[in-house]
C-alpha cells in the first residue's frame, strides 16, 4: 500500500552524496594547491579562507558519518528488541501512553 524507500536505497543515496562531496573537496584542494605561490594579497586571503572552509567541511562530514552510524546502530537495536519481544514493546508503549495521558490531564486541571 505504502511505498517506503528501502533502507539500502537510502544508505546508497547518502553514500553517493558523501562520495560527491569528497570528490568536490579533493578537486578544490587540488585547485588550491595548483594555484600555489602566484597568489598575492586578496587572492592569498581567499585561498586561505577556502582551505579553512575545506577543512571544516571535511570535519563536519566525518562527524555526520559517525552520528549516522550511531543512529543506525540504535535503530537496529530497537528493531531487534521489538521483533524479539513484541508484547513487552506493546506494554512499554501502553505504559508511556498512560503516563503522558496522566501528565496532560493534570495540566488541564
Curated annotation (Swiss-Prot):
**What residue intervals traverse the membrane?**
87-106
Q: Does the keyword Cell inner membrane apply?
A: yes
Q: How does it sit in the membrane?
A: Single-pass membrane protein
What is the annotated signal peptide range for this record? none
Could you tell me the keywords of this UniProt record?
Cell inner membrane, Cell membrane, Membrane, Transmembrane, Transmembrane helix
The protein's location, in the record's own words, is: Cell inner membrane
Repressor as UniProt keyword: no
Induction comment from the UniProt entry of this chain: Maximally expressed between 6 and 12 hours of growth, in early stationary phase.
GO MF annotation list = ribosome binding
Q: By its UniProt entry, which InterPro entries does this protein fall under?
A: DUF883_C, DUF883_N, YqjD/ElaB
Where mainly found?
A: membrane
Pfam families, alphabetically?
DUF883 (PF05957), DUF883_C (PF19029)
Show the GO cellular component annotation of the record: cytosol; plasma membrane
Family, as annotated: Belongs to the ElaB/YgaM/YqjD family.
Q: How does it assemble?
A: Upon overexpression binds to ribosomes.
PANTHER family according to UniProt: INNER MEMBRANE PROTEIN, INNER MEMBRANE PROTEIN-RELATED
Entries under NCBIfam families matching the protein: PRK10132.1 (NF007523)
Name of the protein: Uncharacterized protein YgaM
Task: Give the gene that encodes this protein.
Answer: ygaM
Amino acid at each position: 500500500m505504502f511505498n517506503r524507500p528501502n533502507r539500502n536505497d537510502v544508505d546508497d543515496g547518502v553514500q553517493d552524496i558523501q562520495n560527491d562531496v569528497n570528490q568536490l573537496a579533493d578537486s578544490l584542494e587540488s585547485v588550491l594547491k595548483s594555484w600555489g605561490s602566484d597568489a598575492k594579497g586578496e587572492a592569498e586571503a581567499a585561498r586561505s579562507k577556502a582551505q579553512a572552509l575545506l577543512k571544516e567541511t571535511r570535519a563536519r562530514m566525518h562527524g555526520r558519518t559517525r552520528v549516522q552510524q550511531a543512529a543506525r546502530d540504535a535503530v537496529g537495536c530497537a528493531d531487534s528488541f521489538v521483533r524479539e519481544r513484541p508484547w513487552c514493546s506493546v506494554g512499554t508503549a501502553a505504559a508511556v501512553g498512560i503516563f503522558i495521558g496522566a501528565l496532560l490531564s493534570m495540566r488541564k486541571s
